[in-house]
From Swiss-Prot:
NCBIfam families: nadC. Signal peptide: none annotated. Keywords: Glycosyltransferase, Pyridine nucleotide biosynthesis, Transferase. Quinolinate binds at residues 106, 142-143, 164-165, 175, 205, 226, 252-254, 274. Belongs to the NadC/ModD family. Hexamer formed by 3 homodimers. GO terms for cellular component: cytoplasm. Pathway: Cofactor biosynthesis; NAD(+) biosynthesis; nicotinate D-ribonucleotide from quinolinate: step 1/1. GO terms for biological process: NAD biosynthetic process; quinolinate catabolic process. Residues 12-16 are annotated as: Important for hexamer formation. This is Nicotinate-nucleotide pyrophosphorylase [carboxylating]. It comes from the Eukaryota.
């Protein structure tokens, strides 16, 4: 039987080789040739204190660790991934050659600052969902930063929300442009099923009850009700569930942390928000030697 503590060890989500590939890219981006600052400070062994300077949820520890591991430094933490953290507090230390600490400083801080910001916003919406006793799932989207998606999707997990599909190859989502290019929903779903087979879920973006029913009857497992006002959403979702009980209903489009509670309802299974990875406030950290 799996150790219960493993379900809190978020680092197990990401293979080491994946993290190392990203770390190498980030470090080369920040220092593509000479390290002038490193020449100035030398290579004596020093200890830097990691300070949290704004409240939030800690996320991004595996990336922070991997950056300094690559630079022959040792990181020690006083908090665990997913913990609430307060300003101003010491949450860890980095020990190693001072030039290498400074070489990794900004890259590492960028990672945990952004990851923690996403996790903090995600956690606040998870708490709101529990407050309203809504039993559906809050999810992110593919509205992520090119080259940084693995960190952002990981941070959603730490914050307690669903990542949604990771990329175009993870699930087939047929949006308005797919439908218009194909001619109709039924044909688009049929074409998708032919290549996706039994193991690939199909989701269709719909703008009306009629489109939603067509998508469900064509075999889509998930129907996205896009840009619906809350009352229209709940009415449409109830009717759709009454006719197609097994379909998963997702609400999306224009939903944010201020309006999300209006979309909680017994017939809505998923609410997805782009603002989780686009409209968050990074948590402020600094390293002090």
């Amino acid at each position: 039987m799996a150790d219960e503590s493993a379900f809190r060890n978020f680092s197990l989500l990401i293979p080491k080789v994946v993290i190392e590939k990203h770390v190498e890219t980030w470090l080369k981006e920040d220092t593509p040739s000479f390290d002038y600052g490193g020449f100035v400070v030398g290579s004596s062994v020093e200890k830097a204190v990691l300070l949290c300077k704004s409240d939030g949820v800690l996320a991004g520890v595996p990336f922070f660790n991997a950056i300094f591991e690559k630079l022959d430094c040792k990181v020690e933490w006083q908090n665990n991934e997913g913990d609430p953290i307060k300003a101003v507090s010491v949450i860890g230390t980095v020990t190693g050659p001072v030039n290498k600490i400074l070489l990794g400083e900004r890259v590492a801080l960028n990672c945990i600052s952004r990851a923690s910001g996403i996790a903090t916003k995600s956690r606040s919406l998870t708490n709101l969902k529990e407050q309203y006793q809504w039993h559906g799932e809050i999810a992110g989207t593919r509205k992520t930063t090119p080259g940084f998606r693995v960190v952002e999707k990981y941070a959603l997990e730490v914050g307690g929300v669903s990542t949604h599909r990771y990329d175009l190859s993870t699930m087939i989502m047929l949006k308005d442009n797919h439908i218009w290019s194909t001619g109709n929903i039924t044909r688009a779903v049929k074409n998708a099923r032919r290549v996706g087979g039994f193991s690939m879920k199909i989701e269709v973006e719909c703008r009306s009850l009629e489109e939603a029913l067509e998508a469900a009857h064509a075999g889509a497992e998930i129907v996205m009700l896009d840009n619906f006002e809350p009352q229209a959403l709940h009415t449409t979702a109830k009717t759709l569930k009454g006719k197609c009980a097994g379909v998963i209903i997702e609400a999306s489009g224009g939903i944010n942390d201020s309006s999300i509670a209006q979309y909680f309802g017994p017939h809505v299974d998923v609410i997805s928000l782009g603002c989780l990875t686009q409209g968050y406030k990074p948590v402020n950290f600094s390293l002090k030697i």
